[in-house]
């Protein structure tokens, strides 16, 4: 239990002490229903696992996804000044404008798959500080941004897909992973939005400089977030926390979104029990990060765009899992004997 110091992060840490849990009784009823559906048990593979996951978090035998959204957070990064990206920082605003005009990849996927889209522009004209020179955020600002992200599920949603946009944010994510998990910085750095060898080397150098500068803060995941993260990453931490409080499942997108999840996983792995990981990014270190969190992604399509595009595709799988489980006929419907109990190893 954290000591009460009156510091902004104490309010955030207090939320970790009151975690909602899945309804195991509802999950058990869903498992029994699954055993009675008109198919060989297990024949829908991971869709069956997802359906039981949803049943537990929704607390019902027949889960439904009717109000899914993509929550897309955009932020800018002071470390961009270190020459770590081929793209000017203004592209972040350009892409936010494009999200609003329905011209980006994520807009097409949301329209196709029936997903709402909420775009959050996080003070793009005031990038977080350059972490090679000072912490990206102060504690008050970081905590306030986490709290802002907690509002993303306001209005009632039943599935949240997280996405992001921010020139330079793969560098911030790589720094977070390196700070959380250690190892060679080079192993956490990839091409981002098309970095060449020189830019990749500058990413590595910037992260090493930041790790040395903030060495005294590396034993606290929230401090790591504060020192290296962007506002979009901090806000996504908040969304994951608030979704847990409301028992709303979360779909984690790729490399950058996973860095927000990693901060929480390092605090307590159970903080991610309501999360599904959408896909393995083509960003080289993403598989390594997933392994560090003990997570398996649903898809591996070689994608590395961000924007929540991988999460949007995975949401289609989640919706499919709910629809098949909840809508299919059962053995009893066609006059066959019901399965009335499950072996202990199949009850969950």
Model segments located where?
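N-terminal loops that bind phosphate or other acidic moieties
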Residues: 2-348
């Amino acid at each position: 239990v954290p000591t009460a110091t009156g510091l902004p992060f104490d309010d955030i840490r207090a939320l970790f002490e009151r975690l909602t849990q899945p309804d195991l009784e509802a999950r058990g009823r869903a498992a029994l229903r699954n055993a009675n559906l008109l198919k060989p048990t297990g024949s829908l593979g991971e869709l069956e696992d997802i359906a039981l996951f949803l049943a537990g978090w929704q607390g019902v035998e027949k889960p439904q996804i009717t109000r899914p959204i993509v929550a897309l957070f955009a932020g800018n990064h002071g470390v961009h000044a270190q020459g770590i990206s081929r793209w000017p920082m203004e592209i972040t605003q350009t892409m936010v404008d494009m999200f609003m005009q329905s011209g980006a990849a994520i807009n097409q996927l949301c329209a196709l798959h029936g997903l709402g889209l909420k775009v959050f522009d996080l003070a793009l004209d005031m990038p977080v500080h350059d972490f090679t020179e000072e912490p990206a955020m102060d504690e008050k600002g970081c905590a306030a941004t986490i709290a802002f992200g907690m509002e993303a599920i306001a209005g009632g949603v039943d599935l949240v897909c997280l996405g992001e946009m921010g020139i330079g944010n793969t560098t911030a994510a790589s720094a977070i992973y390196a700070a959380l998990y250690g190892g060679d910085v080079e192993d956490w750095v990839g091409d981002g939005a098309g970095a060449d060898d020189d830019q990749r080397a500058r990413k590595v150098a910037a992260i090493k400089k930041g790790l040395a500068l903030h060495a005294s803060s590396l034993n606290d995941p929230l401090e790591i977030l504060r020192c290296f993260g962007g506002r979009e990453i901090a806000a996504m931490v908040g969304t994951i926390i608030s979704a847990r409080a409301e028992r709303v499942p979360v779909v984690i997108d790729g490399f950058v979104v996973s860095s927000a999840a990693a901060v929480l996983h390092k605090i307590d792995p159970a903080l991610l029990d309501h999360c599904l990981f959408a896909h393995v990014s083509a960003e080289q270190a993403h598989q390594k990060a997933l392994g560090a969190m003990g997570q398996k992604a649903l898809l591996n399509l070689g994608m590395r765009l961000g924007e929540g595009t991988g999460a949007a595709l995975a949401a289609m799988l989640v919706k499919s899992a709910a629809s098949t489980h909840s809508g299919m006929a059962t053995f009893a419907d066609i006059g066959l004997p019901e399965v009335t109990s499950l072996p202990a190893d199949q009850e969950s």
